[in-house]
Design a protein with these regions (language model features):
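C-terminal beta-signal and adjacent terminal beta-strands/loops
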Residues: 495, 543, 594-601, 609-611, ...
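Short, acidic, small-residue-rich periplasmic hinge/interaction motif at the N-terminus
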Residues: 26-64, 72, 139
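Structural signature of Gram-negative outer-membrane beta-barrels, strongest in the C-terminal barrel
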Residues: 346-497
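Gram-negative outer-membrane beta-barrel transporters
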Residues: 349, 391, 489-498, 516-600, ...
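Extracytoplasmic beta-strand/coil segments of soluble accessory domains associated
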Residues: 72, 76-113
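A beta-strand signature from Gram-negative outer-membrane beta-barrel systems
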Residues: 129-175
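Membrane-embedded beta-barrel scaffold of Gram-negative outer-membrane proteins
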Residues: 302-318, 437-440, 466-523, 528-530
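Flexible loop and strand-edge segments within Gram-negative outer membrane beta-barrel domains
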Residues: 211-217, 227-239, 245-303, 309-336, ...
C-alpha cells in the first residue's frame, strides 16, 4: 500500500516537473533584474524565497484561484503540516508543524496570538476565510523581529491577517455571500465597510453556518461491508467581528477588534461496530477584544503595543446510562488578560534591534468538585538583532520566559524559568541568480497546559516543560526559465527536530496519568514548487505542489515494542498538487491532497494502521461586473473519487460532496 502510494504521488509530481527540467537549460540570467522588483514588493506579501527560515504564504488571490473556502483546506496545501481533522463540517481541526504537535504551534489573528490555556491547542475551524486577506506559516523563528514575544515562544506559527478596508470611488463597500452544499450546508456571509472622515474607517462582518453533517460512509468489518450514515455530526455556528482602523499620520495608527463566536455541535465520536448511538454535544462561546497601536519616530525607531481580553466558555454533555444520573456535564470558563509592547531600532539601513515584552494572566474555572481553579501569570521578553542586506540576512534572538501558577485547591507546580535562543542565516552566493542558502536553529519549549497539570485524576503538577530543538538547512530559488514560464519558484529544506520530556498519558494501576516519558527524533524534507505559465493571450496556468517526508520515531526506551516506531498520526509521505487554468470565461482548478500510511497508536502494527489516501477536488469559478457590482459564482466538487478514508482512526471523512457559492461586492 505504501509503495503504491509513493509511486502514484511521484508520478503526479514528475508529470508536471519534467517540462521544467527540460527547459532549465534555456535560463536567461539577464531577466533577473525584472525579478528584483518582486522581492521589493514582498514587504506587502512576505517573500518566501528571501526568508532565512521556512515561510509559506497564501494570499486572498491565491485562495480564490485555488477555490479554497475553508481555512483547514488552505493549511493542508502547506508542506510540513499535519491537520488533525476529526471529520464532519463541524469537526475539531488543529495544526501540527513537522510532527511537533499542535501545542507547539502558535496561531495569531491580526498579529495577536489566539490561546487556550486549558488544552494548549487552537481549533482553526472557528475562523472564516471570507474576511481573510492572507495566511502564512513560519517554521522556526521568523525573520520579522518586530512582533510580540509570544510569537517567539513556539516552534511554528500560523498567522491569519484579515482584510482592511480599501476605498476607491465611494466611502463604503458591501459584500454578501451565500454558500450551500451537501449534507445540509448553508452559510450566509455579510460584510460592510465604511470610511469615517479622513482618518477613520470601520468594518462589520457576520457569518452564520448551519449543517446537518449526515454524510454516508462505508464501514468495513472483515469481509462484511455496509453503508452507514454519520450521526450527531450537525453544527450551528455564528461569527461576528467588528474592526476600527485609525490613521493619524505622524500620530501613528490604531486598530481595534471585537470578535464573537458561538456554536453548538454534535460529537459523532468514533465508529463503533453495531452501535451508532452518539449523544455527545459541545457548546462553545468565545469573545475577545484587542487593540493594536503602532508609530514610527525619526525613521529609525518604531513602537507598537497590543492589549487583549479573551473570554471562553465551553459546555460538554453526554447522555448515557453509564453515568450517575444518566448524564455527564462539564463546564469550563477561561479568562485571559494580555498586554504587549515592543520597540524596533534601526541605527543603519542593514542593522535592526528589537525588544518585545508580553505579560498575560490566565484563569480556569470549572464545575469539578474541589477543582484547583488555577491562575497563571506569564512573562515573556524577547531581544533580537538582525543584519539584512541584498546578499545576507542573519538573525539572532533570545527569549526569556517566566511562568507561575496559583491554585485554590491542591498542590501547585513549581515556577518555570527558561532562556530560549534562536539563530538563522540566509545567503545569496551568486549576484546574478536569485538563489539562496539558508540555515536555522531554535531551542523552544512548551509549558504543561491546565489539562496536563490539573485534569481530574489524570493531571500531574510535577510535570516538566516539553522541550524541542529545531535544526533546518535548505535553499530557495526563483527565476524566469524561459518566455514559456513566467516564474518558477523552488524551496527545499531538510530538518532535524528533537523532543525531550514529551508529555504523554501513561497507564498507572487503574487510571491514566500525565508523565514526562517521551523522547522523539524527527528527520524530514519539505519541498515546495510553483510555476506561472502564460499559455495564450488571457490564458495562463498556475502550478503549485508541496511534498513532505517525515521520519518521526519514538526513541524513549529501547526495551519497548514501539522503540523507533513512527509516532501516531504522522505520515512519512504527504503532499499536494494544484493546477489552475485562468481564462476569460471560467477559471478551473484541480487539486490533489495526499497522505501516506499512518498509525493510530505507538506500535506500528497492522491493527493500528490507517491507510493512505488521495483526495481529488475540482473547483470552477467566474467573476463578472454588472453596473457597480462584482459577482462571483463558484462551484466545487470535493473528494471526486468518493473514497472513504480516515485522518483520525474511526472518524471517517465525507465522501463526494459539492458546494456552490454566489458573492456580490458593491
Amino acid at each position: 500500500m505504501q509503495n503504491l502510494f509513493i509511486k502514484r504521488l511521484s508520478g503526479l509530481l514528475g508529470a508536471w516537473l519534467f517540462p521544467f527540467v527540460a527547459l532549465y537549460a534555456q535560463v536567461d540570467t539577464t531577466t533577473y533584474h525584472q525579478l528584483s522588483g518582486v522581492e521589493v514588493l514582498g514587504k506587502v506579501r512576505p517573500s518566501t524565497t528571501r526568508e532565512s527560515t521556512p515561510l509559506q504564504v497564501m494570499d486572498k488571490a491565491g485562495m480564490e484561484r485555488l477555490g479554497v473556502q475553508d481555512l483547514s483546506e488552505a493549511v493542508k496545501r502547506f508542506s510540513g503540516v499535519t491537520v488533525q481533522d476529526y471529520g464532519g463540517i463541524g469537526g475539531l481541526k488543529t495544526v501540527s508543524v513537522r510532527s511537533l504537535g499542535a501545542k507547539h504551534t502558535a496561531v495569531s489573528y491580526d498579529g495577536v496570538t489566539v490561546t487556550d490555556a486549558q488544552s494548549g491547542q487552537v481549533d482553526i475551524s472557528r475562523f472564516s476565510l471570507d474576511n481573510v486577506d492572507m495566511i502564512s506559516l513560519s517554521i522556526g523563528q521568523a525573520d520579522d523581529i518586530f512582533q510580540t514575544a509570544r510569537m517567539y515562544a513556539s516552534a511554528g506559527a500560523l498567522s491569519i491577517k484579515t482584510a482592511a478596508p480599501l476605498f476607491k470611488e465611494k466611502s463604503y463597500n458591501a459584500y454578501v455571500k451565500l454558500k450551500g452544499g451537501s449534507f445540509g450546508l448553508f452559510n450566509p456571509v455579510v460584510r460592510y465597510e465604511q470610511r469615517i472622515g479622513n482618518r477613520w474607517s470601520a468594518s462589520l462582518h457576520a457569518d452564520w453556518l448551519s449543517a446537518k453533517g449526515d454524510y454516508p460512509f462505508t464501514l468495513i468489518n472483515g469481509k462484511e461491508v455496509t453503508e452507514e450514515t454519520r450521526k450527531n455530526s450537525d453544527v450551528q455556528s455564528l461569527r461576528l467581528e467588528g474592526n476600527v482602523y485609525g490613521h493619524f499620520g505622524q500620530g501613528g495608527k490604531l486598530n481595534g477588534k471585537v470578535y464573537y463566536y458561538d456554536s453548538e455541535r454534535g460529537l459523532p465520536g468514533s465508529v463503533i461496530l453495531y452501535n451508532s448511538n452518539a449523544r455527545e454535544r459541545v457548546w462553545d462561546n468565545n469573545f475577545f477584544t484587542q487593540l493594536h497601536y503602532e508609530n514610527e519616530w525619526f525613521d529609525r525607531l518604531k513602537f507598537q503595543a497590543n492589549a487583549k481580553y479573551n473570554y471562553s466558555f465551553s459546555k460538554y454533555r453526554d447522555i448515557s446510562n453509564k453515568y450517575s444520573g444518566g448524564k455527564q456535564e462539564d463546564l469550563n470558563t477561561q479568562n485571559e488578560y494580555y498586554g504587549s509592547a515592543g520597540i524596533l531600532y534601526t541605527p543603519c539601513s542593514y542593522v535592526s534591534f528589537s525588544l518585545n515584552t508580553d505579560i498575560a494572566r490566565n484563569t480556569l474555572v470549572n464545575n469539578f468538585v474541589n477543582a484547583p481553579t488555577p491562575k497563571r501569570w506569564t512573562s515573556l521578553t524577547a531581544f533580537a538583532i538582525q543584519y539584512k542586506s541584498p546578499v545576507l540576512t542573519a538573525t539572532a534572538s533570545l527569549l526569556s520566559t517566566y511562568i507561575t501558577d496559583k491554585v485554590e485547591n491542591g498542590d501547585r507546580p513549581a515556577d518555570k524559568k527558561r532562556l530560549s535562543p534562536a539563530v538563522s542565516i540566509s545567503w545569496r552566493p551568486f549576484q546574478e541568480q536569485s538563489f539562496r542558502i539558508r540555515a536555522s536553529y531554535k531551542d523552544i519549549f512548551r509549558v504543561p497546559t491546565f489539562t496536563d497539570l490539573y485534569y481530574l485524576r489524570m493531571g500531574n503538577v510535577n510535570l516538566k516543560p516539553e522541550k524541542a530543538t529545531q535544526y533546518n538547512i535548505g535553499f530557495t530559488w526563483n527565476d524566469e526559465i524561459s518566455p514559456f514560464i513566467r516564474l518558477l519558484s523552488v524551496s527545499v529544506d531538510g530538518y532535524y527536530n528533537k523532543v525531550s520530556d514529551k508529555i504523554v498519558a501513561i497507564p498507572n494501576m487503574y487510571i491514566w496519568k500525565m508523565m514526562n516519558m517521551g523522547e522523539v527524533e524527527i528527520k524530514g524534507i519539505d519541498v515546495n514548487l510553483s510555476a506561472n505559465i502564460p499559455l495564450y493571450k488571457a490564458f495562463s496556468l498556475l502550478l503549485l505542489s508541496s511534498y513532505s517526508y517525515q521520519d518521526a520515531i519514538d526513541v524513549t526506551d529501547p526495551e519497548e515494542k514501539n522503540y523507533k516506531n513512527q509516532i501516531p498520526y504522522t505520515p512519512r509521505h504527504s503532499g499536494s498538487v494544484s493546477a489552475s487554468l485562468e481564462n476569460p470565461w471560467v477559471n478551473v482548478t484541480y487539486t490533489l491532497v495526499a497522505a501516506g500510511d499512518r498509525y493510530a497508536l505507538p506500535q506500528n502494527i497492522e491493527a493500528n494502521q490507517i491507510d493512505s489516501y488521495i483526495e481529488h477536488s475540482l473547483s470552477v469559478n467566474r467573476s463578472f461586473a454588472l453596473k457597480k457590482c462584482t459577482f462571483k459564482v463558484q462551484g466545487d466538487i470535493l473528494n471526486l473519487t468518493d473514497k472513504t478514508y480516515d485522518i483520525i482512526q474511526y472518524y471517517p471523512m465525507p465522501g463526494r460532496s459539492w458546494r456552490f457559492s454566489l458573492s456580490i461586492t458593491y
